[in-house]
């Protein structure tokens, strides 16, 4: 994963691997999705705690976000925090909130 961050006017760039997050490498073929319905199902499964390659990808991406925002000091710590949010049910609950909100917008003028 290519990772860029901005600090004190300097852009830093690094290539991070699953190992940087304390995770095992996964084959790219295991990350293939499908149509919108299948991808929604995959996202729900990952946020419900399903293990596997897709969870690894989510932990890396969420972890990178936690590092950029300063909510984690290292990629490993960030992936651990992201995993805790998934395993606690908080991530899926937030998705459900977003879904309910967006569906409420359908009827808005």
Where are these regions (language model features)?
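Glycine-rich anion-binding loops and their surrounding alpha/beta cores
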Residues: 1-109
